[in-house]
């Protein structure tokens, strides 16, 4: 994976390199080495240092490798988080989206003061040098306006002057025509998934000799990773870092390798159900420790309370009704974050009631499975939920001839796999989902035999005929809608929607 460093954006004298993207989209443009003086001309002679579109391909570069592949330019421009160093070498996190005009900075008043001071000087200089260009110049801003109102404009214009980008890459040629995007990107930190190594490359701008880039390896990168750990989610497959605030919009799919990360039940409801149509069922049903399970570490009730506070859920499943592309459905979604999605008496009862409600209302049924199996703290009461749910599904499927779709996510194991997880009329699995009855560790310890790698992955099991299809999250809602319509479940017309509401 690659993590970008925007190094010392606040130091005027370090504005030494210009990065250009040529009009040809198959290569990253050259980097020009400009001179740097004690009084940097970038603030007073900006126009002299900016090349026109016709001059882009004439730039030359020395001792500088490509900074980023062309295929990553779109992502770089739209949404990126930068680790920014100020003049005192302190690091801060900045999330910046030009197109959406979003700017988020670590809340540190000293850093913000320095940033404000720099951009105030920068904007004043640009305003004075371009005051004769007319009202249409995009460098002209009211320098007396408040910091809060103009910070996005300051940074956007600062970034516009160093990288020349083809208009179509931005998707808005009119807005960004004849403008330049500044980038003072010092380097990338490349992380190898196998070795878990991190290397940072930082531009050396104080001394412009033959070695324009200094490579630094060590524990500093690990410290930075820990410092900003709350901003990122690490992919369990490639170990790439995904920014938390945009991961949800990507359906919790790793932007580096496409791996499907775990997803909360609430996010799945938002993904599958039409907005404003979700009606939860049995939200107040909670476990009361039916067998008074004894634990030397933490009492069962206390553990339940802890997970309720952490997840905001009452149990490991959410059940209810809603519309999927206008089609009324009954849906149950298990949440692995709540005690590993384990199936206790409450989980079994909620799913059974959901099946019975769908039977009475003649609704199609969806159950999204994500579970480690039966909950050991409830003993045989948790095991009997397998038979109870299966019995309700028998009436739903065979007697009422209704349609049940089972969706297996990672992980789906134990009693859930052995019961309702495998009883769907259509069984769908997510890519790379871990699906098994007994886990790999349990099998190896019990049978003293090694479990072949990948033998419990969705792709291998699909080829063995264990389920019907592997469907990524992106097209899942549309595919479910088509399946329901093939089985004579159609979207409600407006009058029916109003009468049901």
Swiss-Prot record:
It is an enzyme of class 2 (transferase). It is found in: Plastid, Chloroplast stroma. Pathway: Lipid metabolism; malonyl-CoA biosynthesis; malonyl-CoA from acetyl-CoA: step 1/1. The keyword Hydrolase does not apply. Zn(2+) binds at residues 235, 238, 254, 257. Its EC number is 2.1.3.15. A zinc finger (C4-type) spans 235-257. Its cofactor is Zn(2+). SUPFAM superfamilies: ClpP/crotonase (SSF52096). GO terms for cellular component: acetyl-CoA carboxylase complex; chloroplast stroma. It catalyses: N(6)-carboxybiotinyl-L-lysyl-[protein] + acetyl-CoA = N(6)-biotinyl-L-lysyl-[protein] + malonyl-CoA. Component of the acetyl coenzyme A carboxylase (ACC) complex. Biotin carboxylase (BC) catalyzes the carboxylation of biotin on its carrier protein (BCCP) and then the CO(2) group is transferred by the transcarboxylase to acetyl-CoA to form malonyl-CoA. Belongs to the AccD/PCCB family. Acetyl-CoA carboxylase is a heterohexamer composed of biotin carboxyl carrier protein, biotin carboxylase and 2 subunits each of ACCase subunit alpha and ACCase plastid-coded subunit beta (accD). This is Acetyl-coenzyme A carboxylase carboxyl transferase subunit beta, chloroplastic. It comes from Lotus japonicus (Lotus corniculatus var. japonicus).
């Amino acid at each position: 994976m690659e993590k970008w460093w925007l190094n010392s954006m606040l130091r005027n004298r370090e504005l030494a390199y210009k990065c250009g993207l040529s009009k040809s989209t198959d290569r990253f443009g050259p980097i020009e080495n400009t001179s740097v003086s004690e009084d940097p001309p970038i603030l007073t002679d900006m126009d002299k240092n900016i090349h026109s579109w016709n001059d882009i391909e004439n730039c030359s570069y020395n001792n500088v490798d490509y900074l980023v592949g062309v295929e990553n330019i779109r992502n770089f421009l739209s949404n990126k988080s930068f680790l920014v160093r100020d003049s005192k070498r302190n690091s801060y996190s900045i999330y910046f989206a030009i197109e959406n005009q979003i700017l988020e900075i670590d809340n540190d008043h000293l850093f913000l003061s320095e940033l404000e001071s720099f951009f105030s000087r920068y904007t004043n200089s640009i305003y004075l040098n371009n005051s004769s260009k007319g009202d249409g110049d995009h460098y002209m801003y009211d320098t007396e306006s408040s910091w809060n109102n103009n910070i996005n404009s300051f940074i956007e214009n600062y970034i516009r002057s160093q990288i020349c980008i083809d208009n179509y890459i931005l998707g808005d040629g009119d807005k960004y025509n004849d403008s330049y995007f500044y980038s003072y990107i010092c380097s990338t930190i490349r992380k190898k998934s196998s070795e878990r190594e991190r290397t940072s490359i930082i531009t050396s701008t104080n001394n412009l000799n033959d070695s324009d880039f200094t490579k630094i390896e060590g524990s500093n990168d690990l410290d930075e990773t820990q410092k900003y750990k709350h901003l990122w989610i690490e992919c369990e497959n490639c170990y790439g870092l995904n920014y938390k605030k945009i991961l949800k919009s990507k359906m919790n799919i790793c932007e580096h390798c496409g791996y499907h990360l775990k997803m909360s039940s609430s996010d799945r409801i938002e993904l599958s159900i039409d907005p404003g149509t979700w009606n939860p069922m049995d939200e107040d049903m909670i476990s009361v420790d039916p067998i008074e399970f004894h634990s030397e570490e933490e009492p069962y009730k206390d553990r339940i309370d802890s997970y309720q506070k952490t997840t905001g859920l009452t149990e490991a499943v959410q059940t209810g009704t809603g519309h999927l592309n206008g089609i009324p459905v009954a849906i149950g979604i298990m949440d692995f974050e709540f005690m590993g999605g384990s199936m206790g008496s409450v989980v079994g009862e909620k799913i059974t009631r959901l099946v019975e409600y769908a039977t009475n209302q003649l609704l199609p049924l969806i159950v999204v499975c994500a579970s480690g199996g039966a909950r050991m703290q409830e003993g045989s009461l948790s095991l009997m939920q397998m038979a109870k749910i299966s019995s309700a599904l028998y009436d739903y499927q065979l007697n009422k001839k209704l349609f049940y779709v089972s969706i297996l996510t990672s992980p789906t194991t134990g009693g859930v796999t052995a019961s309702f997880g495998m009883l769907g009329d259509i069984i769908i699995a997510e890519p790379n989902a871990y699906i098994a009855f007994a886990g790999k560790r349990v099998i190896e310890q019990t049978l003293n035999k090694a479990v072949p790698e990948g033998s419990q992955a969705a792709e291998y099991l699909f080829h063995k005929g264990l389920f019907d299809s592997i469907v990524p999250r992106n097209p899942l809602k549309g595919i479910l809608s088509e399946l329901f319509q093939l089985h004579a479940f159609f979207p409600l017309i407006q009058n029916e929607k109003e009468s049901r509401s």
